[in-house]
Amino acid sequence: MQKKSIYVAYTGGTIGMQRSEQGYIPVSGHLQRQLALMPEFHRPEMPDFTIHEYTPLMDSSDMTPEDWQHIAEDIKAHYDDYDGFVILHGTDTMAYTASALSFMLENLGKPVIVTGSQIPLAELRSDGQINLLNALYVAANYPINEVTLFFNNRLYRGNRTTKAHADGFDAFASPNLPPLLEAGIHIRRLNTPPAPHGEGELIVHPITPQPIGVVTIYPGISADVVRNFLRQPVKALILRSYGVGNAPQNKAFLQELQEASDRGIVVVNLTQCMSGKVNMGGYATGNALAHAGVIGGADMTVEATLTKLHYLLSQELDTETIRKAMSQNLRGELTPDD
């Protein structure tokens, strides 16, 4: 039986960094040298893999929509030559990149796993070894044909993840959807609902930078704060509200949202809570937002909502189509109402 072959896109991040007097820094070729010294990556059970190092290597804090586009085009260029793809990435914006790729890559017929580490691969107690080893093995032997994120022995749907711990190995959470797979003594696929999946050739949708605001509601927030966020050229606003989607019933505040909606700005309501979903019909305060033209974001993460808006705004769709699509389950990013 022919061995599977996995393409590794090494964008940067902690996993390949080297210690210096200024702290950890990315060094070209360092990751590859470390992997050559680790025999477990070259056991016969492991797939073949090719590492493509990006130039320059990036700290994920510098990641932009142009970089998401570059990664997606890289996957497209090598799509027919490999059985799966692993993206090595810094943890700070990993959930954003995984979410963005999920929307950009339509009709995905091969696994794309995003992973990295909290401690560099070359350092004692690095989590990079087990994360990368498992990502390669799972991509080859337990393929799930969507964009996923592997960290600390769990494989998550990428657009359901958020970074939940700044310095722990259990760095990522999927608050509203169980993992797709767990890698313990045995590797187990879980009965997690599948994402919607189309048929046909892989389509890579473009993403371009879009002016999107994010506002967290807090006690005493003024209409002026919201007004400043809604100034041109903003095309969309994510409103992080209380509980199931509640916000102050301040008339000036609601008027700003109504006027923004009338101007064609897409306003999406997300809960500040770690888990659960928005239901703007549950309380009068949430209902007032709906009457002001605000769309409910269901149980999407901020990362999924932001990248979904980037994706839709990049397609030159009219405002009403974008509003409808924000409430639709395109890539498994939200839980539809029963």
UniProtKB/Swiss-Prot annotation:
Additional free-text comment from the UniProt record: E.coli contains two L-asparaginase isoenzymes: L-asparaginase I, a low-affinity enzyme located in the cytoplasm, and L-asparaginase II, a high-affinity secreted enzyme.
Complex formation: Homotetramer.
One annotated GO biological process: protein homotetramerization
Residues holding L-asparagine 1: D59, S60, S61, T91, D92
NCBIfam families assigned: asnASE_I (TIGR00519), PRK09461.1 (NF006998)
UniProt catalytic activity: L-asparagine + H2O = L-aspartate + NH4(+)
Family to which this protein belongs: Belongs to the asparaginase 1 family.
Keywords tagged on the record: Allosteric enzyme, Cytoplasm, Hydrolase
Name the record gives this protein: L-asparaginase 1
Catalytic residues (UniProt): T14
Matches recorded under Gene3D superfamilies: 3.40.50.40, L-asparaginase, N-terminal domain
Entry-linked PROSITE patterns: ASN_GLN_ASE_1, ASN_GLN_ASE_2, ASN_GLN_ASE_3
A GO CC annotation given for this chain: cytosol
Residues binding L-asparagine 2, per UniProt: T162, R240, T271, Q272, C273
